[in-house]
Amino acid sequence: MRILLAAAECAPMIKVGGMGDVVGSLPPSLIKLGHDVRVIIPGYGKLWSLLDVSNEPVFRANTMGTDFSVYEAKHPIHNYVIYLVGHPTFDSDQIYGGENEDWRFTFFASATAEFAWNCWKPQVLHCHDWHTGMIPVWMHQDPEISTVFTIHNLKYQGPWRWKLEKMTWCPWYMHGDHTMAAAMLYADRVNAVSPTYADEIKTHEYGESLEGLLNYISGKLRGILNGIDLDEWNPAKDSVLPAKFSINNLENRQENKKILQREMGLEVNPKKYLLGMVSRLVDQKGVDLLLQVSRRLLAYTDSQIAVLGTGDRYLESGLWQLALDYPGRFSVFLTYDDSLSRLIYGGSDAFLMPSRFEPCGISQLLAMRYGSIPIVRRVGGLVDTVLPHDPENNSGTGFCFDRFEPIDFYTSLVRSWEAFRHKDSWKLLQKRAMSQEFSWQRSALEYEIMYKDVCGIKEPSPDVAEVEKFSYGQSADPSLKKV
């Protein structure tokens, strides 16, 4: 099948959130299944020097009253084809924000539609989040191109109808209130990035005022869990980690822990319980819960906390004040640093994700891969990926709580701290977490089933029986299943 993915991000070149990881890592797994998969993204300024871009455009056209060109490049790691939409509105390196954000992405969607109609015509055009939301609306006219729309975060919904009517030429059948609603209404298939999130967004609590529409289209809505690139994220080969380790030599993690403590200004003591967090510092991620419980936790236990990220200034200030009040025990770096994030995954004892909502979450998968035990709220993709620790039955992969309340989060933190003191049991917990496999293999099989379904292809694909061989979290190594 010919499949074109359209998105605002593509890792590792352009990445802000989980969407970039999906768009960058899903194509190689689909290509292994025999499909011709390509990606189209805006031609942001820095991409022209990062990628080997064709000298001449492969396509030129005019849309929304302005000319644009499409150039061809190759993904720097996986070598599949990437198309860049060239236009002065994308010349800066800024991805989101700005006064013309709505126009920029509506223009990108229109340019992508023109490209798909007139240059490289896919059988499936896979659109990601509101930035590409107008594509299913336009493609609804073309019976030869099927559209799939993936919801990465329902909270961000794009420009409203009145603004779209001014920017586009087809307001008369725009029944949705905004880009996200229009995409869900007109796409042939819709998926969320985890099964639990697909169910949650049909409720008032998580539906962001779209629960009515989501229930209306529930027949074409499904949840497909994201994965991670197991080659890129491998603690046994990670060049960034000072000490490489695997499930068979966990003692090497202690060296990473000491270096992490030193780099973040914490007391260097491997016996201390070290909690890590790598996140956007926003309400969605539950940073306000961390602010509410940290003082009590640090008073009651000998824990240390290391936070890496940027975001809301109020939350940043609260974390900074904690670092001033608890030197050597609480540290925050208000930036994003890939090397330091890997060190946190590979050196912390546990990883914090007390999210208000979490469509899928990638960080908990990386934490488990690197032996850091996730402490999560049971919501969205965290429900699908982290199993509650049960010391009596030696099962589970993390610590979970249900209500978004400080006392519930605090209780999970204390439970994890007490579990950490039982070293043999903790080591088994780490091994269970590290033995989980959330590769893109199963996700790609599920996407393939959806693609063939939407195109009406009846020939057998690796169907449900084949997919079941790769149950979520199942280890590829049979020897690890008994841990």
From Swiss-Prot:
> What does this protein's UniProt record list under function?
Synthesizes alpha-1,4-glucan chains using ADP-glucose.
Which InterPro entries does the record associate with it? Glyco_trans_1 (IPR001296), GS/SS (IPR011835), Starch_synth_cat_dom (IPR013534)
**What Pfam family is a match for this entry?**
Glyco_transf_5
Gene3D superfamilies (UniProt xref): Glycogen Phosphorylase B
Q: In which pathway does it act?
A: Glycan biosynthesis; glycogen biosynthesis
**A biological process term (GO) from this entry:** glycogen biosynthetic process
For this protein, what is the EC number? Answer: 2.4.1.21
Query: Could you tell me the keywords of this UniProt record?
Result: Glycogen biosynthesis, Glycosyltransferase, Transferase
* Name of this chain's protein: Glycogen synthase
Source species: Prochlorococcus marinus (strain MIT 9301)
